[in-house]
Amino acid sequence: RRIYPEAIIVHEGHIKNGNVVPSHSHEIVKSLENGKLIMTNQRYVSTPGGWHSWPCSTLTTVLMASDEDIGLILTGTILGATFLQSGIKYWDRFRASSWHGPTGNFWSSAFRLVGVPLFSPVGGSSEFLTMQAALPLIEQNQVVYCMEKDGGACRKCTKCLRRELIRTVIDSQFEPKWDTFDSPSIHAFLEKRPMFMGHIYSYAYSTHSESLPTWMTSRIQDLQKINTDWPMKQLDQSFDFVDEKWRNDLLKKINDFYQSMTIEEFNEMKTWGE
């Protein structure tokens, strides 16, 4: 919404056992002039529920493509997923394009082949950057990332913990509240190696350890160190994976928000997980 305000926003409201799963995001999307809220049971059509593969989350948009004249589907998949295997180890997507097609991902390449390109413009941006761009909306309670407590944030899960950590890094006015996260399940998560989205915790420890509770720092201080600011920079080369027809306009707009990684920063990112 902040970087590409002209884009149509398609959001699925989930139906489970005949009932709508509560989410604060429903009212937010309905209030947007370019918002499309679609109710569907596709995520819970089987038992156990869940996406059968990640492209299923875009199915509604694909079905709407003709009626809405959608020429490109933008997703919000971030750097940790596109290049870092959920923050565990660097994945050379550029090299993978030799066997996964021009996008470096066989699903995205398939979408491109059938004429409805699928691309994440924040695929070269960490969650630090995406939250930084969304901060004005977050302050207006216009961003939903956890729905476990009556459709809103539970402030107990690992996703909520990561959001608290990220905002501590990018928002100097933010006062984090850590008490609800000091639990055996969170401790176990922090101790597990390799660590899910470990680069987020490593960078936060490197730059803001004084703002973190000791029960957290004692469990993440052994993570691989990050010496440059690559988690706070955008990887421009990620736009190599979108068709030239869209590339320049998409990249120009994201560069209005983010600084680009230097070669030194990109090279350090490539060592993550070694």
State each model region's role:
Residues 2-274:
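Nucleotide-activated chemistry modules centered on ATP-dependent adenylation/adenylyltransferase
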